[in-house]
């Protein structure tokens, strides 16, 4: 699988199916597309593959994937990426698809916020609950510091080596990053509005052990203001039950979780009800022929929000998409057990 986080080109990538979303359903769709003879390109707004599984609960167990009694969300994503390898679908991360237009020849042209263009015969939207954006710190003095001293993600631990850090949040991401940062930062303080957490028990236990060992601090309270004379963060004001305190820090990492937003999808002319794209359950096609939806973003009566359901939806959608990519060609069904070409691809991808 080829990956790119930043591409801008005047020549559009050409493919049979554009898959919007690199969560479990989007990744499986790329594999299934290859199995039935379709090329695909995957685009996702987030900087890493995995969708909600990786962004919200990477280390929580999943029990309802056929033939896998138990695995973490991270393990599932890793296995799906491995499954895709025989077809090497281009994977463009950190790209939000902003516009989708139908060309005179019936094909689709999609453009991302970073200048990537993809032309395809069909589009499969597997974007979960839409684009994920971080919940920002709701303080007027935070915005000018974002990207320099106030952060909503970590790209490289080394960027914070020797720095004083405050990490805000109570979920897995906040605790895990606080624990990771303590290995490189001069000092780390985790702050959360209460003494209870939404993180896994193991993450909470690891954090409390680190605090007891003096490897990091934990404080209960809410961030009231930022002290940044000359535009450089020096401390935060933490409001607590007994009053306010100043915590010295060089950087503030805010991990309040992610919020879902359909964003530009609402402007693509597909019927949307209750935040879901309405689909025909015979083929999971939207109200615009050639645009399909699978996974949590697909809406229909008795919808079950399961990864398993998304796999089924994507499989049927791609079979209809085949007719747009190859209208004059009859698709011949071959069971994977008897597909010699598939066997060769799988073998080659592991050499």
Swiss-Prot record:
Pfam family, one: Pyr_redox_2
Cofactor binding, per record: Binds 1 FAD per subunit.
Reactions this protein catalyses: 2 reduced [2Fe-2S]-[ferredoxin] + NADP(+) + H(+) = 2 oxidized [2Fe-2S]-[ferredoxin] + NADPH
Enzyme class: oxidoreductase
EC number: 1.18.1.2
GO molecular function: ferredoxin-NADP+ reductase activity; flavin adenine dinucleotide binding; NADP binding
Keywords, sorted A to Z: FAD, Flavoprotein, NADP, Oxidoreductase
Cofactor(s) of this protein: FAD
Superkingdom of source: Bacteria
Residues holding FAD: 44, 52, 57, 97, 132, 296, 337
Subunit annotation: Homodimer.
Family membership noted in the UniProt record: Belongs to the ferredoxin--NADP reductase type 2 family.
UniProt-listed HAMAP family: FENR2
Designated name of the protein: Ferredoxin--NADP reductase
């Amino acid at each position: 699988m080829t990956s790119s986080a930043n591409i801008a080109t005047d020549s559009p990538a050409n493919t049979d199916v554009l898959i919007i979303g690199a969560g479990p359903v989007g990744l499986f769709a790329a594999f299934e597309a290859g199995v039935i003879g379709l090329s695909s390109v995957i685009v996702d707004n987030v900087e890493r593959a995995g969708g909600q599984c990786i962004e919200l609960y990477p280390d929580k167990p999943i029990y309802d994937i056929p033939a896998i009694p138990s695995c973490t969300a991270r393990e599932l994503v890793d296995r799906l990426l491995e499954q895709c390898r025989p077809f090497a679908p281009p994977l463009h991360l950190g790209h939000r698809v902003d516009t989708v237009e139908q060309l005179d020849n019936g094909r689709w042209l999609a453009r991302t916020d970073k200048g990537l263009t993809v032309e395809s015969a069909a589009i499969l939207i597997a974007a979960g609950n839409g684009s994920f954006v971080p919940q920002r710190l709701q303080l007027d003095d935070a915005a000018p510091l974002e990207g320099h001293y106030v952060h909503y993600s970590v790209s490289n631990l080394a960027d914070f080596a020797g720095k004083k850090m405050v990490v805000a949040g109570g979920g897995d991401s906040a605790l895990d990053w606080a624990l990771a940062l303590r290995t490189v930062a001069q000092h780390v303080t985790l702050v959360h509005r209460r003494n209870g957490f939404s993180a896994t028990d193991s993450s909470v236990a690891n954090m409390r052990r680190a605090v007891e060992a003096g490897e990091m601090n934990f404080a209960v309270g809410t961030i009231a203001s930022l002290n940044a004379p000359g535009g450089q963060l020096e401390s935060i004001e933490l409001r607590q039950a007994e009053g306010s305190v100043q915590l010295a820090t060089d950087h503030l990492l805010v991990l309040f979780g992610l919020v879902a937003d359909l964003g530009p999808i609402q402007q693509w002319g597909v019927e949307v009800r209750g935040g879901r794209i309405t689909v025909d359950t015979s083929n999971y096609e939207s109200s615009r022929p050639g645009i399909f939806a699978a996974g949590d973003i697909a809406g229909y009566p008795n919808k079950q929000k399961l990864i398993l359901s998304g796999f089924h939806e994507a499989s049927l959608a791609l079979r209809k998409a085949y007719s747009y990519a190859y209208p004059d060609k009859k698709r011949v069904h071959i069971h994977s057990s008897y597909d010699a070409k598939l066997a060769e691809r799988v073998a080659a991808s592991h050499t």
